[in-house]
Amino acid sequence: GLTAGLSIHALDSFREYSGLKNTKSVVSGATGGVGSISVMLLSKLGSEVTAVTGKNDQSDFLHSIGASNILSREELAETAKKPIGKSLWDIGVDVASGEVLSLLLTSLSPGGAIACSGLVGGHSFESSIFPFILRGNALIGIDSVEIPLEDKRHAWEHFSHDWVLEGLDKIIKEVPLEDLEVEIESILSGGQIGRVLVKI
């Protein structure tokens, strides 16, 4: 949950702590570990969350953790066919990069921002300058590894106070060590949902 927490904190900071309530947000990779926690947290904070997923059979799961709307990757591509499109979201959490990030950037509202932390969709992306100079949008990189321990502690304190999440059992699967190989194969094939807790 650290990366998700840092992403949400960065977006809140970008909005000068005006709060995330009543915002429209988008989360890519929404069935994964970072994505699912982001959906839950944004929903808890009062944002209307659109979950973007390549797992079209997981709508019930995504609704159960707080997503108001669900878009397939194909539907996302249909919403963004121009360098700058209709304003759909105020903020976003992107774990994919690549084409998905390119598409999300075209649909941000004026003054919007995306916190990007992953590269499962590729290590590069394409964008025009328009979202940045015509709408004042921002792309915020999230580093959850090299940041100071104090910054990590600050995020964890949020989770233990004002960001306490209920229903984590929906996104956590506990497995014995001998089943770890099966879970790794599921991750590599893109079939993993939520987080896996290995019981030793």
Identify the residue ranges that each predicted region occupies.
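Local beta-strand N-terminus motif with an aromatic residue
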Residues: 67, 88-90, 132
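Short amphipathic alpha-helix with an adjacent loop that forms part of the alpha/beta core around
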Residues: 76-87
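Short, well-ordered coil/turn residues at beta-beta hairpins
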Residues: 94-95, 200
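Mid-domain Rossmann-like dinucleotide-binding core that forms the NAD(H)/NADP(H) cofactor-binding site
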Residues: 1-73
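Glycine-rich phosphate-binding loop and adjacent beta-alpha segment
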Residues: 99-165
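C-terminal hydrophobic helical "lid"/dimerization subdomain
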Residues: 150-200
